[in-house]
């Protein structure tokens, strides 16, 4: 019987981790890992932080070159898959070559969402999704530069903190009336907003950009409030567009992302997907959920690798992610939309835990500079328990 061939399209966090997991689980067939970028798989979280701050900081690759050789993973960087042919179990490369697969894993991730109104201003418009993006930003963000960040989500705020630390003057423009609205409870939103403002970041919340123009080297934005903001460069932090067109063209079910089940299987039995490109259907509610985090990419990669081999996947834990801003480590686990939040510790001292509850049940937690406690919280929230009555929330 011939060896099976598993092809992975997308050589980011999820793709590389899936390939590694397949070998860890003793898959002895061929693994082909295809990546569009001209870089081996690398860690992305540092791109908005250490990599920008320290000019000597080198990219952090997920695995060494020797790893791919030793594990017999055929890593093909700088290649693009242009078509999937599910009925023939093959993918077509941009150069016209065809590769046959037994199982296919799609991990193409996402691209930064852009703002056409601002794109017309020229070359001083930046995004941050890739190592190449980070290298461009490294050259642009300098002392006394006026940085306009469009979007007050995690990436926008991390870039605001990093840019300030480099001596830039930073303004954040956010359409919503809060920051990190999709992923943080109100207590954390207010805390982070205060910290950024104390460091000199200017915020325009509940604000839209209605016009933009370039005057010499200056970028001038007019807001719906009538106010004018001027910058030297603009950085987008307005979310992502998911690279699901390849899947949609192949007839897979998509809905603003590739729809997968709890085993990371798509609507085609031999095609799986993992990471930022996915929408996963929750078994209990049937709702489609997207989680664009490092942890989720690793978790889904592991689940997909097991499923491709016909193995029982590991039990998923509660969703977890982190952000570092102003030297403050913030970790979040579970449901950030809980009905009630309780504080243990002192936010003013940058050391506290926020507990989210619904009907007296612990459903989420935020640890601020409390990394050790987060380990216990993650274990606890893997199997949610009734909060003990009588607990005093300090």
UniProtKB/Swiss-Prot annotation:
Annotated keywords: Aromatic hydrocarbons catabolism, FAD, Flavoprotein, NAD, Oxidoreductase
EC number: 1.18.1.3
Entry-linked SUPFAM superfamilies: FAD/NAD(P)-binding domain, FAD/NAD-linked reductases, dimerisation (C-terminal) domain
Pfam families cross-referenced by the UniProt entry: Pyr_redox_2 (PF07992), Reductase_C (PF14759)
InterPro entries named among the record's database cross-references: FAD-oxidoreductase/Apoptosis, FAD/NAD-bd_sf, FAD/NAD-binding_dom, FAD/NAD-linked_Rdtase_dimer_sf, HcaD, Reductase_C, Ring-hydroxylating_dioxygenase
Residues holding NAD(+): 146-174
Record flagged with keyword Iron-sulfur: no
Pathway where this protein functions: Aromatic compound metabolism; 3-phenylpropanoate degradation
Annotated FAD binding sites: 5-36
Record's catalysed reaction(s): 2 reduced [2Fe-2S]-[ferredoxin] + NAD(+) + H(+) = 2 oxidized [2Fe-2S]-[ferredoxin] + NADH
Any GO MF annotation of the entry: 3-phenylpropionate dioxygenase activity
A GO cellular-component term linked to this record: cytoplasm
GO terms of biological process kind: 3-phenylpropionate catabolic process
Entry keyword Iron: no
Cofactor(s) the protein needs: FAD
Subunit structure, as described in the record: This dioxygenase system consists of four proteins: the two subunits of the hydroxylase component (HcaE and HcaF), a ferredoxin (HcaC) and a ferredoxin reductase (HcaD).
Protein function: Part of the multicomponent 3-phenylpropionate dioxygenase, that converts 3-phenylpropionic acid (PP) and cinnamic acid (CI) into 3-phenylpropionate-dihydrodiol (PP-dihydrodiol) and cinnamic acid-dihydrodiol (CI-dihydrodiol), respectively.
Family that this chain belongs to: Belongs to the bacterial ring-hydroxylating dioxygenase ferredoxin reductase family.
Official protein name in the record: 3-phenylpropionate/cinnamic acid dioxygenase ferredoxin--NAD(+) reductase component
Organism: Photorhabdus laumondii subsp. laumondii (strain DSM 15139 / CIP 105565 / TT01) (Photorhabdus luminescens subsp. laumondii)
Gene: hcaD
């Amino acid at each position: 019987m011939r060896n099976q061939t598993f092809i992975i399209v997308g050589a980011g966090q999820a793709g590389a981790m899936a390939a590694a997991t397949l070998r860890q689980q003793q898959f002895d067939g061929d693994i082909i890992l295809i990546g569009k970028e001209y870089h081996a798989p690398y860690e992305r979280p540092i791109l908005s932080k250490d990599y920008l701050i320290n000019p000597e900081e080198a990219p952090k690759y997920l695995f060494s070159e020797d790893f791919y050789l030793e594990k017999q993973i055929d890593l093909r960087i700088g290649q693009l898959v242009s078509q999937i042919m599910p009925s023939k179990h093959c993918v077509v490369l941009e150069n016209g070559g065809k590769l046959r697969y037994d199982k296919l894993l799609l991990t193409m991730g996402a691209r930064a969402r852009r703002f056409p109104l601002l794109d017309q201003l020229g070359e001083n418009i930046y995004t941050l999704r890739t190592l190449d993006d980070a290298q461009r930003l490294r050259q642009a963000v300098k002392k006394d530069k006026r940085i306009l960040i469009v979007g007050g989500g995690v990436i926008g705020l991390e870039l605001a903190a990093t840019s300030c630390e480099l001596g830039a003057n930073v303004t954040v423009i956010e359409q919503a009336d809060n920051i990190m609205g999709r992923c943080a409870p109100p207590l954390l939103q207010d805390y982070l907003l205060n910290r950024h403002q104390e460091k000199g970041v200017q915020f325009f919340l509940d604000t839209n950009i209605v016009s933009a123009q370039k005057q010499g080297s200056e970028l001038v934005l007019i807001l719906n409030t009538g106010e004018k903001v001027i910058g030297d460069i603009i950085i987008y932090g307005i979310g992502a567009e998911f690279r699901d067109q390849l899947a949609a063209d192949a007839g897979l079910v998509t809905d603003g992302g590739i729809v997968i089940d709890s085993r990371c299987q798509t609507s085609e039995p031999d095609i799986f997907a993992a990471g930022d490109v996915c929408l996963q259907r929750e078994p209990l509610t049937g709702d489609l959920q997207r989680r664009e985090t490092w942890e989720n990419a690793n978790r889904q990669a592991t689940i997909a690798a097991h499923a491709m081999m016909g193995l029982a996947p590991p039990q998923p834990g509660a969703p977890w992610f982190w952000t570092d801003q102003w030297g403050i480590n913030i970790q979040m686990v579970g449901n950030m939309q809980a009905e009630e939040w309780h504080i243990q510790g002192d936010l003013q001292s940058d050391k506290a835990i926020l507990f989210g509850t619904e009907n007296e049940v612990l459903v989420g937690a935020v640890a601020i500079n409390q990394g050790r406690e987060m380990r216990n919280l993650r274990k606890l929230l893997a199997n949610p328990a009734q909060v003990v009555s009588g607990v005093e929330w300090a």
